[in-house]
Amino acid sequence: MHGAAVTPPSTVSPTPVPTQSAPLSVALVSHRCPDPCEVTGFHSRRVHEPCEIRPSDDVVLFYGPRMGQELRRFSTEANGGLPPFAVLATCLDWDDVCLALDSGAIGYLLEIEDPDLLAAALHCISHGHTILAPQIAEHARVTSCPGGALRQTAAVARPDTSGSATGRTGDSSPSLALSPQEREIMTRLASGLSVREIAVEMRLAEKTVRNYLSHIYGKLGVRSRSQALLRWLGHPGGETAHH
């Protein structure tokens, strides 16, 4: 197996996750890899197109290397009609992490040795909780200073040595910089909702939500949804998403 064991990091909501009497139904998207042994305890089946997703599915799991592009295709073609979806990667690829998060994934895990850990993570994801592999969450904490690069190896953003325009330091919680409305939008964004879905739930125009996000990105010193999510979720002061 690749990567360290995935333990639920600080991105999991403290709200207890209800126990399910029936096993999770997992729609598995994987083109070349064999089924991961970790999902054998669930009702899982292979799917190749978004139209194959069933209303009874609890989670869509994209398994294998560089599945971000396929995840984006599913998300776009389903037009918001997917259950919570996540990636189980065979190796850590920062470009793929950001592509998956930008496309609405609420989980990005690495292959693990203990099936019980993945089972717990998938149950949390099925209830809308965001789960990141510890390596991803820790990297976000270390490089989460305003204006700094969230993933230096992929050069998503160049470090800003001049500091933030707001005068905040890397030790400040990202939530402190945001208004209550902006925090609510980030909470919903972290749960995997699209701009359209956030607008509907908050009874706002889509343009208004996009304007809010533009201001949020500026305050957090980031340039994209994935960077904002890593900053928001990876920082110890970040807030978790729950429905």
UniProtKB/Swiss-Prot annotation:
Residues 195-214 bind DNA. The keyword Transcription regulation applies. The macrolide antibiotics FD-891 and FD-892 induce morphological changes of human promyelocytic leukemia (HL-60) cells and have cytocidal activity against tumor cell lines in vitro. FD-891 produced by Streptomyces sp. MAFF 225003 and MAFF 225006 inhibits growth of rice and alfalfa seedlings and may cause russet scab in potatoes. The gene is gfsR. Residues 171-236 form the HTH luxR-type domain. This is Probable HTH-type transcriptional regulator GfsR. Pathway: Antibiotic biosynthesis. Residues 161-178 have a biased composition (Polar residues). CDD domains: LuxR_C_like (cd06170). PROSITE patterns: HTH_LUXR_1, HTH_LUXR_2. Residues 154-179 are annotated as: Disordered. One of its GO terms (biological process) is regulation of DNA-templated transcription. Probable DNA-binding protein that contributes to the control of expression of the biosynthesis operon of the 16-membered macrolide antibiotics FD-891 and FD-892. Might be a member of a two-component regulatory system; the putative sensor kinase gene is unknown. The keyword Transcription regulation applies. GO terms for molecular function: DNA binding. Keywords: Antibiotic biosynthesis, DNA-binding, Transcription, Transcription regulation.
